[in-house]
Amino acid sequence: MGCNEALEYARKLVASLEKHVYDPVYKGYFESCKPDWTHDPWTRGVNRLPTDEKTMNNHLHLIEAYTCLLRTDKSDFMQNKVREHLYVMLNKIVDHDIHHYFYFQARDWKPTTQEISFGHDIEGTWLMMETAEVLGEPEAMRYTKDTCMNMARACYEQGFRKEDGAMLSEYDPVTGHSSPFLSWWEQNEAVVGFLNAWEVTGEEKYLDASLKCFEFAREHFVD
C-alpha cells in the first residue's frame, strides 16, 4: 500500500468512525459496536455495566490516531475534530479536582466508577501534550500543559513507588485499595510520561523517576 493509498484508507476509516461511533449529542465516541456498527455497550468478559458507554482508554487511543493523521491531513475537518477531541478529554474525562482521568463514564459523561489508573494517566500526559503541539494553538497548548503537569505530579506523588521505581496499576480512592498487580505497559508509559514532564518543567525528580521506571521495567519485564 502506497502513501496515498494509506492516507485515503485512513480518511475513510475516520469517516466511518464519525458516522457510526461519534456521539453528536454529548460529543466523544462510544466504546464498542457490533460488526454492523450497531451500538453495543461493552460488558462481556469484564465487570462493567451497560451504562459504561465511554472510556478514557478508547479516547486516548483515538486521539493518538487522529493526531497522527493531522500531521499529514491539515484539512479544516481534521483540525476541528482533533481540537474538539482534545477539549472533550480536558473538560469531560479529566477530573480536575484530583488530577486523574475518570475511568468509565456514561454517555452524558457522568462517572460510573471511582478507580484511578496510573498507567493511563501518565500515558495521557504525553499524548495530550503531543496533540496540543500538533494542533498548534497557543491557548490549547497552555491549557493542556497545565492539566498534564498536574496529572504528572499526581502520578508521581501517588502512583510512583520511589523505593524501587515501579509505577503502580490501579487505586480506588474510596476504599483505599491498590491493585497488587504490575504491568509492563504501565512502566513503559511512565518512562515516557515522566521524561516528558522533566522536559516541560525541568524538575529533576521526573527525570529520576523516568530512569528508575526504565531500570525497573528492564529488570522485571524483559525476558
Region spans (language model):
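Glycan-recognition and catalytic cores of secretory/periplasmic carbohydrate-active enzymes
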Residues: 1-223
